[in-house]
Swiss-Prot record:
GO terms for cellular component: photosystem II; plasma membrane-derived thylakoid membrane. It holds the Pfam family PsbY. Its main location: membrane. PSII is composed of 1 copy each of membrane proteins PsbA, PsbB, PsbC, PsbD, PsbE, PsbF, PsbH, PsbI, PsbJ, PsbK, PsbL, PsbM, PsbT, PsbX, PsbY, PsbZ, Psb30/Ycf12, peripheral proteins PsbO, CyanoQ (PsbQ), PsbU, PsbV and a large number of cofactors. It forms dimeric complexes. The gene is psbY. One of its GO terms (molecular function) is manganese ion binding. It is a single-pass membrane protein. This is Photosystem II reaction center protein Y. It comes from Synechococcus elongatus (strain ATCC 33912 / PCC 7942 / FACHB-805). Keywords: Membrane, Photosynthesis, Photosystem II, Thylakoid, Transmembrane, Transmembrane helix. The lineage of its organism: Bacteria, Bacillati, Cyanobacteriota, Cyanophyceae, Synechococcales. It is found in: Cellular thylakoid membrane. GO terms for biological process: photosynthesis.
């Protein structure tokens, strides 16, 4: 594997993973809020 390919792909994969993590966290918070709202 060419090191230049790793240098180019690493930040893209890191940014993509970070975005998925943040979106997933926000979605879980919304689901929890919706469930708690239904129970109240």
């Amino acid at each position: 594997m060419d090191w230049r390919l790793i240098v180019v792909l690493a930040p893209i994969l890191l940014a993509g993973g970070w975005a998925v993590f943040n979106i997933g966290k926000a979605a879980l918070e919304q689901i929890n809020r919706a469930l708690k709202g239904d129970q109240a």
